[in-house]
Design a protein with these regions (language model features):
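N-terminal secretory signal peptides that target proteins for export/translocation
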Residues: 1-9
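N-terminal secretory/targeting leader peptides
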Residues: 16-17, 34-123, 131-333
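Hydrophobic, aromatic-enriched, well-ordered structural segments
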Residues: 10-14, 29
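Bacterial N-terminal signal peptides
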Residues: 14-25
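Sec/Tat signal peptide C-region and signal peptidase I cleavage site
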Residues: 26-33
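Residue-level detector of alpha-helical hydrophobic segments embedded in or interacting with membranes
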Residues: 3, 24-25, 110
């Protein structure tokens, strides 16, 4: 007569069988695919878009499509201030941001926004890949944003509806600035009337006379076609603010260490791609706007401009920690 196993013995057999299958890897369910939403203010073919698309591609490849990222280019998910808030809430998972809009949220971002701080692009990259980047990453994490890598954003210069050769020429002109107290004070120190506006409103505001000018790098001036309505570009190169490739802290906290390492590596690789693309695009953009008849005013002596920035430094680098960071950056070789 066949003896049926008792209930405890049947449970034991089932557990042993399950363990055996687990050893063979036969019962391991695949991890659920993650769908990430990303924000970018620029078009997909802009250097930042190229960098972000490289980032998402590398992550997909190294996770076997377990982490799938979709970047919404051209500010489809809102303007930058809105996108920052969405990332802090966790409704945007990753993004490329300019650091200036963080000036009122993350104190160390004020340092890299300070005018005439960097000698050249190489100096800026050494600073942001070193002490400045470390300080900013800590401050950003405190507000819910995890910095993974740093992108170039070029030297920012003035473009206006009439010629500007000296600070005196700016007096009384309405110049668009980013939403940042530092930028407002910077432009006011130059004698202009700072006008905070979303980036997406600059073209129509120039066209209608709401503002007399703005400031940005060559690729932004060209890609947005601002050169059609502001025909003078003065190479003040007053600022060289880097940008951050970041993820939401809420999303980051749900990742294991292996996936975090994949994202960090992918971000660094994407930054190298973005920086190469940026250097190439700067040259092309300058050639395009020059060919379109823009008057380029070369500012070779920036001393009269930088001399006006003392009150800005006194206000935004007065804190001992920030003053020390400014010194570190200036001493970098």
């Amino acid at each position: 007569m066949m003896i049926k196993p008792t209930r405890p013995r049947r449970a034991l057999f089932a557990a042993v069988a399950a363990a055996a299958l687990g050893v063979l890897g036969l019962t391991a369910a695949p991890a659920a695919a993650q769908e990430w939403r990303g924000w970018n203010i620029h078009a997909a073919d802009y250097p930042n878009g190229v960098g972000m698309d490289a980032f998402t591609r590398i992550v997909a490849e190294r996770t076997n499509n377990r982490i799938r990222m979709r970047t919404f280019h051209s500010a489809q998910l809102g303007q930058q201030d809105e996108a920052i808030q969405q990332m802090r809430l966790g409704t945007i998972d990753f993004a490329n941001f300019n650091l200036s809009p963080f000036n009122n949220l993350a104190p160390s971002t004020n340092v890299v926004t300070l005018p005439f701080l960097f000698r050249d692009v190489g100096h800026m990259q050494r600073a942001i890949d070193g002490p400045a980047g470390e300080a900013i990453a800590r401050d950003l994490e405190n507000i819910g944003i995890i910095a993974l890598a740093w992108y170039d954003a070029g030297a920012r210069s003035l473009y206006t509806t009439r010629a500007v050769r000296t600070p005196a020429d700016l007096r009384g002109m309405k110049i668009r600035v980013q939403t940042s107290d530092l930028w407002i004070d910077l432009m006011r120190a130059l004698g202009a009337n700072p006008t905070p506006l979303p980036f997406g409103e600059v073209f129509t505001s120039l066209q209608s006379g709401v503002i007399d000018g703005a400031e940005n790098n060559w690729p932004s001036y060209e890609s947005t076609r601002h050169f059609e309505v502001a025909r003078f570009y003065s190479t003040t190169e007053h600022s060289n603010v880097p940008e951050v490739l970041a993820v939401s802290r809420q999303r980051w906290q749900r990742l294991n260490e292996a996936d975090r390492a994949i994202l960090r590596d992918a971000a660094r690789e994407s930054a190298a791609i973005q920086r190469r693309s940026w250097a190439e695009r700067e040259q092309v953009s300058r050639q395009r706007v020059t060919a379109a008849g823009v008057t380029v005013i070369e500012i070779t002596d920036r001393a009269p401009w930088s001399a006006l920035m003392e009150p800005v430094y006194a206000k935004y680098a007065a804190d001992a920690r920030l003053a020390a960071l400014v010194r570190q950056i200036r001493e970098l070789r």
